[in-house]
A protein has these predicted regions:
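Thiotemplate assembly-line natural product biosynthesis machinery
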Residues: 1-22, 74-80
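Catalytic nucleophile serine of serine hydrolases
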Residues: 38
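Conserved catalytic core of two-component sensor histidine kinases
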Residues: 42
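AMP-binding/adenylate-forming catalytic domain of the ANL superfamily
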Residues: 60-71
Length: 80
């Protein structure tokens, strides 16, 4: 799962945050901290679907489902 988290961190930093040098910790809050806003949340959902082939339902686009890289990685692994 560590490799998946590293890949997610890099993709989010570059493609969502547009900050290639940004380091995101596995337990860092993405949504509840405001790092990822509602517009970026849709981009994140599309990134996960396109990159990992995992469908994210609209009802799952919230901090309860994937506020951290760890939560997001577990969701992806559970659906692959």
């Amino acid at each position: 799962m560590e490799e998946l988290i590293e890949k997610l961190a890099a993709k989010i930093a570059v493609e969502i945050l547009k900050q290639s040098k940004r380091i995101i910790r596995p337990d860092e809050a993405l949504i509840s901290s405001g790092l990822i806003d509602s517009f970026s949340l849709m981009d994140l959902s599309l990134l996960v679907e396109n990159e990992f082939g995992v469908r994210i339902e609209d009802t799952e686009l919230n901090a309860d489902t994937f506020d951290t890289l760890e939560q997001l990685a577990r969701l992806i692994q559970g659906r692959q």
